[in-house]
């Protein structure tokens, strides 16, 4: 019996070459069964995520709930997903679509990436699952309905913003639009947006769009938003083919 040992500073591996087998297959005979070498120990890998990830909106809702109940502590969770979500919470989370809700910034980020995942776009849901998959809890009907309302309100406001920005993007203003008292964050968001998707009248479009995005995020009904915009320009009823790209750009601003 021949043994070969491989040594390093941290591990020692022993290979038993007696367990190697050679099998000859003959053309006119069926192959004989091959017996596996018996192993003294069988290692069963432990799952990284202790509980199965729930499918559909339930998955998003369960992670949303876990974020509120389990603040992350570096050293007690996977480091790479922790840093990814931590950086994105600060750098790609400017647009708060539901500012009236008393939820933290990580939950706002989760809402946006849940929406991206829901409509089939690239998201960071895998990082959220890696961080919170082991602490997911069952959702009550009340909690599920509450999250569902919040999720689809986020979706509606996102779609409303894209629709209005498509109209503003195509308009040439006759008179200059003064910058309003809209918070600077909304001006920064639409400025980045029009950098990616240029408007015909960029400067005026930024000033006008910032105030419109603000009122949409504050919950103004779409009918009133359209009525307001239509007082200054014709509504662009037919949207472009690259709306999904625009949604991704908006939600990752």
Swiss-Prot record:
<comment type="similarity">
    <text>Belongs to the herpesviridae BTRF1 family.</text>
</comment>
<protein>
    <recommendedName>
        <fullName>Uncharacterized gene 23 protein</fullName>
    </recommendedName>
</protein>
<dbReference type="InterPro" id="IPR006772">
    <property type="entry name" value="Herpes_BTRF1"/>
</dbReference>
<dbReference type="Pfam" id="PF04682">
    <property type="entry name" value="Herpes_BTRF1"/>
</dbReference>
């Amino acid at each position: 019996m021949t043994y070969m040992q491989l040594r390093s500073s941290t591990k020692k591996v022993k290979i038993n070459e007696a367990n190697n087998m050679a099998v000859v297959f003959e053309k006119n005979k069926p192959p004989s069964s091959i017996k596996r070498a018996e192993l003294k120990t069988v290692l069963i890998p432990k799952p990284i995520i202790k509980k199965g990830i729930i499918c559909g909106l339930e998955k998003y809702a369960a992670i949303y709930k876990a974020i509120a109940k389990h603040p992350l502590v570096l050293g007690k969770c996977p480091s790479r997903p922790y840093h990814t979500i931590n950086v994105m919470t600060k750098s790609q989370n400017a647009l708060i679509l539901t500012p009236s809700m008393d939820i933290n910034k990580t939950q706002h980020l989760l809402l946006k990436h849940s929406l991206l995942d829901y409509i089939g776009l690239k998201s960071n849901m895998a990082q959220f699952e890696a961080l919170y998959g082991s602490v997911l809890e069952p959702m009550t009907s009340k909690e599920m309905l509450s999250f569902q309302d919040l999720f689809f309100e986020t979706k509606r406001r996102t779609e409303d913003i894209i629709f209005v920005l498509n109209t503003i993007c195509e308009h040439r203003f006759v008179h200059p639009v003064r910058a309003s008292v809209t918070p600077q964050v909304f001006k920064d968001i639409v400025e980045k947006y029009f950098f990616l998707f240029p408007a015909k009248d960029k400067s005026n479009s930024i000033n006008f769009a910032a105030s419109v995005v603000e009122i949409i995020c504050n919950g103004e009904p779409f009918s009133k938003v359209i009525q307001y915009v239509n007082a200054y320009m014709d509504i662009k009823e037919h949207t472009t083919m690259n709306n999904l790209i625009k949604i991704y750009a908006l939600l990752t601003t």
